[in-house]
């Protein structure tokens, strides 16, 4: 009996460690990916208010950062499933220096930038925050005015 219990517990530990945060720790309706949990919020907020909203969940939460095409595809499917309205969605990328130097709010590396054709353009010298675009299936990005009201995608470590 003792040996069976030990083997069972060991298998459970291995199973949970293989799954990591991808299934065990995210709240309901959040997407587990890469050790983080992601949620799209239907509240319309400007970029700064959206970032502050994400940070209020717990320390270390931010607007989402994306680092691969696989991330973009996964988030595209998730946003399409959970976004109740139409519209572009804020992510955590912006150009704070206004010199085409794009930075993530979580300070992760900027290694993936699937811009829409002719973007970014800083149109009218007003567009410094980044949204994922609905008419591209949320697979491409556009810079927009940080004051525009959008749904947004948060990422948290749980």
Swiss-Prot record:
Keyword Cell wall biogenesis/degradation annotated: no
Superkingdom of the organism of origin: Eukaryota
Occurrences of domain C-type lectin (ranges): 33-155
UniProt tissue specificity: Expressed by the venom gland.
InterPro entries assigned: C-type_lectin-like, C-type_lectin-like/link_sf, C-type_lectin/snaclec_domain, C-type_lectin_CS, CTDL_fold
Binding site for Ca(2+): 119, 121, 127, 142-143
Alphabetized GO MF terms: carbohydrate binding; metal ion binding
Glycosylation sites: 134
Signal peptide start-end: 1-23
Entry's localization field: Secreted
One cellular component term from this protein's GO annotations in UniProt: extracellular region
UniProt keywords, alphabetically: Calcium, Disulfide bond, Glycoprotein, Hemagglutinin, Lectin, Metal-binding, Secreted, Signal
Disulphide bridges: 26-37, 54-154, 129-146
SUPFAM superfamilies xref list: C-type lectin-like
Pfam families attached to this UniProt entry: Lectin_C
Motif (Galactose-binding): 119-121
Assembly and binders: Homodimer; disulfide-linked.
Function: Galactose-binding lectin that binds to and agglutinates erythrocytes in a calcium-dependent manner.
Protein name per its UniProtKB record: C-type lectin galactose-binding isoform
Taxonomic lineage: Eukaryota, Metazoa, Chordata, Craniata, Vertebrata
